Design a protein with these regions (language model features):
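Short, acidic/turn-prone active-site loops that include or flank metal/cofactor-
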Residues: 1-2, 57-59, 181-184, 205-211
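Acidic, Mg2+-coordinating active-site environments of NTP-dependent enzymes
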Residues: 1-75, 95, 99-121
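Nucleotide phosphate-binding/pyrophosphate-handling subdomain across enzymes
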Residues: 1-3, 13, 78-201
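Short, solvent-exposed loop/helix junctions and linker helices
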Residues: 8, 89-92, 212
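Hydrophobic beta-strand segments of well-ordered beta-sheets in folded domains
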Residues: 26-28, 51-52, 176-179, 200-203
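Short beta->alpha linker loops
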Residues: 32-36, 57, 157, 184, ...
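C-terminal helical cap/extension that packs against the catalytic core
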Residues: 34-53, 150-153, 190-223
Length: 223
């Protein structure tokens, strides 16, 4: 849960606010299907006469692994096998969602007509995923900033993100893992801290903005 002061304190309340982006007659793709939220999205889509697709109902991504080059390899139904520049495990769900969006963009005429060629759109999708950071400027998504030792940057700031990050921090075969960690004071601090693995080395810090939790307070909460 995140931004609860604006969106609500339960998944169904947050889903209701998020569903406000559904526009009349415009298709919508929902990337994550949860029992608490599915009916909320279905009701809003019906109200707006909008086609709704739950990406997890018919997965496009059938397998995904980390490569030796610190990228993520995807095996998909409609786009073959390709590499994604963003290596984090959470990208599997994001990629599956995006691959459901592409056909809808074509159908809605929101991509150039020449992209309707299957070979061309497949090539473009593969290129986009392999160069996503340089094409978009997206940073801090399990981003390798150095090797020997591996240095990884991630902007995970809520329990959803740390459910993935906590596992990822324990998945490598490293004799030691050092974590430099800071968080905003208005986040679910205890919830996030519950996902931090034990027996790692932690260095608590803060951002320069006023919302940041002081490192001393963060250390005390972590203890």
């Amino acid at each position: 849960l995140d931004h609860t002061e604006f969106l609500g304190s339960t998944l169904s309340e947050i889903a209701y606010e998020k569903a406000g982006i559904i526009k009349p007659g415009v298709p919508v793709v929902v990337g994550e299907d949860l029992p608490e939220t599915r009916q909320v999205f279905l009701d809003k889509a019906k109200e707006n006469n909008s086609q709704i697709i739950f990406a997890e109902d018919k997965p496009e991504v059938v397998n995904s692994t980390m490569t030796e080059n610190y990228t993520r390899l995807y095996e998909t139904v409609g786009y073959g096998t390709f590499e994604g520049q963003l290596a984090g495990e959470c990208q599997i769900k994001n990629t599956n969602t995006i691959l459901h969006v592409v056909p809808l963009l074509l159908k809605q005429g929101l991509l150039p007509q020449s992209y309707n060629d299957k070979k061309r759109i497949t090539a473009l999708v593969r290129e986009a995923f392999s160069e996503v950071s340089s094409l978009t400027g997206l940073m801090g998504r399990w981003q390798y900033a150095g090797h020997r030792p591996d240095i990884v940057l991630d902007t995970g700031h809520n329990t959803g993100g740390w459910a993935y990050l906590g596992k990822a921090l324990q998945s490598g075969n490293y004799p030691q893992v050092h974590v430099i960690f800071g968080i905003m004071a208005d986040k679910d601090i205890d919830g996030v801290l519950s996902f931090l693995p034990q027996k790692l080395h932690y260095y608590f810090t803060r951002d320069s903005v006023a919302r940041a939790l002081p490192p001393e307070a963060l250390r005390d909460r972590a203890e």
